[in-house]
């Protein structure tokens, strides 16, 4: 793993402290930046997440993904599901399902509780499956 340092120019290009490049796949990068705006997730009329402190995770071969601090997510109707996945660039993922008045929305949210060492620290952040929410960002 190599960490590169990148400096932007001007007020619209924040300084990126670290861009992770993986030795086992040269050219593959993962990095985060602060989200440029307030982020919200709604399911039906329920506000599930609302933050001004979100992150955008950029990863080679993927679209950018918004991550929300866990403290800004309403966990009261979320339940840990049985689904887990593994990403060689970020680590093992656990998923959460949302209990609603009409049933469950399965695996609506994911979390990397212990990201691999090379990954930016997203252990206190969660992501959402955009196709399963009614309104976002």
Where are these regions (language model features)?
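Terminal leader/tail segments of proteins
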Residues: 1-137
